[in-house]
Amino acid sequence: MNYRIDRRTYAETYGPTVGDKVRLADTELFIEVEKDFTTYGDEVKFGGGKVIRDGMGQSPISREDGAVDLVITNALILDWWGIVKADVGIKDGKIYKIGKAGNPHIQDNVDIIIGPATEALAGEGMILTAGGIDAHIHFICPQQIETAIASGITTMIGGGTGPATGTNATTCTPGEWHIYRMLEAAEAFPMNLGFLGKGNSSQPEGLAEQVKAGVIGLKLHEDWGTTPAAIDTCLSVADKYDVQVAIHTDTLNEAGFVEATIAAFKNRVIHTYHTEGAGGGHAPDIIRVCGEMNVLPSSTNPTRPYTTNTLEEHLDMLMVCHHLDRSIPEDVAFAESRIRRETIAAEDILHDLGAFSIISSDSQAMGRVGEVIIRTWQTAHKMRVQRGRLTGETGENDNLRARRYIAKYTINPAITHGVSDYVGSIEVGKLADLVLWKPAFFGVKPEIVLKGGLIAWAQMGDANASIPTPQPVYMRPMFASFGGAIAKTSLTFVSKYAMKAGIPEKLKLKKTAVAVSNTRNISKASMKLNDALPRMEVNPETYEVRADGELLICEPATVLPMAQRYFLF
């Protein structure tokens, strides 16, 4: 028997389907469902009088015979590869299948089997994204990790040892002893973690020993002396051991100008932090490197997007983070040289063009660890309002722009740092690090954050209430954040050398350790939807930025979505 329902009722019951559009929070961005893997009239949904019951949507098939551990029903997936409606099956902490869930005994085309061993998570009316990756972390305090995961970040990559002066300024975990201690500390957190060693040395031995100890990359920072010799040596070590190099270049141009740094790269791949320059780098033209094939350019979030307040707040941030003294004129000049409205405005447009590939935080060191996702979508909104639809869009939606921007904090940092086999997208075989959002709160406040297929953080009300929803409702840690579950649902990333040398066993790490790979054979072309290579020019006197001859200029935003209306309580 057929029963016909109108589109609105269907969307309210099972979530949007092909042709329906969803607004992202209070932005001017609208995504449209491109494909629906579910079957009309045969959808699965959990609840009293609903479908997932024994003999109906739930089969008697055991876990051993193919039933999944968790099914997320009727979710709207937003990822770099597409925007689709589907059920998602999770098994052994990994994404098992994206498709149609149910009982194959009575339903057709079922590729996700629901059985007695299967838990259900309602995705109707929700947006499902991959957990975010923040690839510019100063590990200044462990509380950052709570803030990050509560915002939808599930992987953090960077360096540090706590609030030491070096860590406050540079993302480096220097030396074997510190590396071992940070790997041990990582055991406590429901977060995938990878550490960067100090990359500043003109001789390779001190760098190689850090890679052997377990870091997944090396960080070159001007506060430690980012000279052409140090750059060359660091990249040579990285090539030998297959780890990534991140760089904060020479703001003062003491050891050479941007041309000297590019020459020192020798066409070897490198991740350039805060490539616009306010966070540090050759003044005023480090932004030029985003046009180089071997450069993987990222932004940090304080300059995202360009607003009327951006310039004013940066000077104070910079003085603190880089241990500068307002009473020393040279220190003030150093700070002022890094803050340029022209390059910050250009950064907005370069992100929209796909010339900047990654957005990260620079946590507590001129960056906000809980705002990577918010700032990314605010930038996308600002560009939608100021520049209109992208030329590559098909249909009356913002799908291409949404896919481009989500790639900046998911798949692209994963590829850059050699962890894309494990995390960074919603694809079969990857760790089930997933985030569910109510569309009205998209990008601002997640509803549920899963780590390795288990709920790690979620919006939760009063624990003494008779139901889960009474106020105060806010993000709280759930069971994947406690006890032995942490080790089974989160990863520690190490170098291939450290993995083969048995460093995880030597340190008696319980958390699953995996090795990074393929960090040296990639390029800008590897960056999903963010691989543009414009010919860059910067006027050294006016700071005007041109890409392929076009002047990049935009007005600062005076008001933004995803802001104060979401944080009244």
UniProtKB/Swiss-Prot annotation:
Species of origin: Microcystis aeruginosa (strain NIES-843 / IAM M-2473)
Gene name of the record: ureC
Binding annotation for substrate: 221
Disulfide linkage: none
Pfam family, one: Urease_alpha
Active site: 322
HAMAP family: Urease_alpha
Protein name from the UniProt record: Urease subunit alpha
Quaternary state and interactors: Heterotrimer of UreA (gamma), UreB (beta) and UreC (alpha) subunits. Three heterotrimers associate to form the active enzyme.
Gene Ontology biological process terms, A to Z: urea catabolic process
Keyword terms: Cytoplasm, Hydrolase, Metal-binding, Nickel
